[in-house]
Swiss-Prot record:
There is a cross-link at residues 34, 249 (Glycyl lysine isopeptide (Lys-Gly) (interchain with G-Cter in SUMO2)). One of its GO terms (cellular component) is nucleolus. Pfam families: Ribosomal_S3Ae. PANTHER family: 40S RIBOSOMAL PROTEIN S3A. The modification Phosphoserine is found at residues 236-237, 263. This is Small ribosomal subunit protein eS1.
Amino acid sequence: MAVGKNKRLTKGGKKGAKKKVVDPFSKKDWYDVKAPAMFNIRNIGKTLVTRTQGTKIASDGLKGHVFEVSLADLQNDEVAFRKFKLITEDVQGKNCLTNFHGMDLTRDKMCSMVKKWQTMIEAHVDVKTTDGYLLRLFCVGFTKKRNNQIRKTSYAQHQQVRQIRKKMMEIMTREVQTNDLKEVVNKLIPDSIGKDIEKACQSIYPLHDVFVRKVKMLKKPKFELGKLMELHGEGSSSGKATGDETGAKVERADGYEPPVQESV
């Protein structure tokens, strides 16, 4: 029998020695997430990212992050069924500057509107804003009983549904095509587009619960820091993006009157 050292015993050092535990959070930094100036509450939260190490830069890891925030948190409001997606486009110091990336209705709101004895009408359209953002807007509306109606059901005829859908697409296209992204978001916050559609379709068939239920961002123009700074209420010459904690409030309450239609 060959006499020698047992390599397996000596190799591992002290048997049962515990590995040194390193706290992963010691290598990470907190960054503030800033919403654009269209919203009342600018500081929407904090995010965690691994500190810059060698070629791996922390700010590159943050760019492209999408945050989904309830409109109630952004506007300090009670109405909480709209969710806005904000994407990080640039990092200035410890601030992540975000831009609009999409909108959605909450699942419970959508389910609460779908009922029996009424017609659900949906439409979608792809539109480009004046500053080059391509958006896909989805709209939903429901028929309602007329004032003196006795019958339980309020179903629209197929021809009426087509007319309403056409009107929905026309209004959505007009409202987005003639405005830039900032103005479109200002219309989505109180959902004035939905109110416009409801008023315009009144002569075809009375509608209720008309909402732009979803907005998708399909294409963006080339990133410009100056434009992002303007969205955050700062001039392009400014270097830091601290900004105020509050933005400008969009005043369009329930009593909002849409413009009068020339032709229906």
